[in-house]
Amino acid sequence: VLDSYLKNEIFLTENELKLSESNLVIMSSKEDMLMRESAAILKAENKIVLNVGFGLGIIDTYIRNHGPKEHHIIEAHPQVCEKAQEMGFEVHCGKWEEVITSFIETEKKFDAIYFDTYVFDYKTNPQWAPFTRLVPKLLSKGGTYSYFNNIAAKVEGVEGIVQEFGWKRSSKDLKHPFDSKPYTLVWFTKNT
C-alpha cells in the first residue's frame, strides 16, 4: 500500500494535499487547530524534535515557531519532500523504516516525537505498531510521544504497546474542526 502511494502523483495547494489519480484528500488545512495543539504539547522550545510525515507542513510550521534546538522531519513521498525543502525545512527523504535505522545505530535521542504518516486505512495502519515499538530507543527520558490519534488510538494495540512501557498518559479533549465527534489529543511521557 505504501509503495502504491509513493508512486502516485500528488496535487499540492496551500489548503490541501491530494492524490492526483483519485482526488483523495490526504491532508487539509482544516486540521490546523489539531496540529497547533499537537505541536504545543510537544513543548519543542530548545528541544530535539522528530516528526514523521510532513503532509502540508502544518505541525512542522508550529514546531519551528516554538524554536526547537533541532527539528528532524521524515517524509517518504518525493513530491512532499521537495515541497518541504522549498519551505525551508531540512528533511530526511525516505521511508521512516530506513531513516530510523540510522538514528538507532547512532543512538540519536529526541525530546519529542510526533508520528502521522499517510495510509489508506488508518484503522488497520500496519505502520503504527512497528514504529511505536521503536520509540523507547529514540525518546529521551522525560520526552513526549504523540501521534495523529483521533483514529490511531483505535488502531489495535497501539496504546497498549505504549502502556507496556509504563509511561504517563495524558489527554486533552478538543472540538474537532470538521467532525461532530470530539477529538482527544493523547500523548505519552517517558519517565524512565
Segments and roles (model prediction):
Residues 1-46:
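Class I SAM-dependent methyltransferase Rossmann-like catalytic core
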Residues 102-117:
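A short acidic, Gly/Pro-enriched loop at the edge of an enzyme's catalytic core
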Residues 70-75:
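Conserved SAM-binding motif I beta-strand of class I
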Residues 56-68:
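Conserved SAM-binding loop of SAM-dependent methyltransferases across substrates and taxa
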Residues 43, 67, 138-141:
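A generic alpha-to-beta junction signature in SAM-dependent methyltransferases
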Residues 123-191:
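C-terminal substrate-binding/active-site "lid" region of AdoMet-derived donor-dependent transferases
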Residues 45-57:
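Conserved class I S-adenosyl-L-methionine
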Residues 76-105:
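S-adenosyl-L-methionine
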